[in-house]
From Swiss-Prot:
Keyword Glycoprotein in record: no
Pathway note: Lipid metabolism; fatty acid biosynthesis
Listed name of the protein: 3-hydroxydecanoyl-[acyl-carrier-protein] dehydratase
GO biological process per UniProt: unsaturated fatty acid biosynthetic process
Highest taxon, organism lineage: Bacteria
Active site (record annotation): H70
EC numbers for this chain: 4.2.1.59, 5.3.3.14
Function recorded in the entry: Necessary for the introduction of cis unsaturation into fatty acids. Catalyzes the dehydration of (3R)-3-hydroxydecanoyl-ACP to E-(2)-decenoyl-ACP and then its isomerization to Z-(3)-decenoyl-ACP. Can catalyze the dehydratase reaction for beta-hydroxyacyl-ACPs with saturated chain lengths up to 16:0, being most active on intermediate chain length.
Intracellular or extracellular location(s): Cytoplasm
Amino acid sequence: MSNANSFTKEDLIACGLGKLFGPNSPRLPKDNMLMIDRVLKINADGGEYGKGEIVAELDINPDLWFFDCHFATDPVMPGCLGLDAMWQLVGFFLGWEGAEGKGRALGVGEVKFTGQVLPEAKKVTYKLTIKRKVYRKLVMGIADATMEVDGREIYSAKDLKVGIFTDTTSF
């Protein structure tokens, strides 16, 4: 497990290259698909269930790539990108705890969208609480999460599932 409890954008980019937690650790996506600018807090025993929590942020500005294509005259951040960020953070948590392999989103129990991220927004905040960690032949994390834009909760997800696989050829 890493001793660090916060991470910069440079750290997150290093994670995408296999240079943060080691070459066999789960990687974050690179470039445009990395939907996180910083991890403010990560721990293994906090959160609602006492199994870990993560708080992370994404800075919003009108020049972000998705505003140009979703939609041409009605720019809004695609909801799937916020959901993907939540899966990214569950995988990041497992890598931070020392898991090795390739991360894959395995599903989500429930997702609710009650707002939107527009180009004039300033900041998205993700808050995840780990519900369950499985470290057997299958490594898996299950979490609940919320996403806020400028302090207002607009997405919630229950039972986000991410697995870490040493072999994905038959996946």
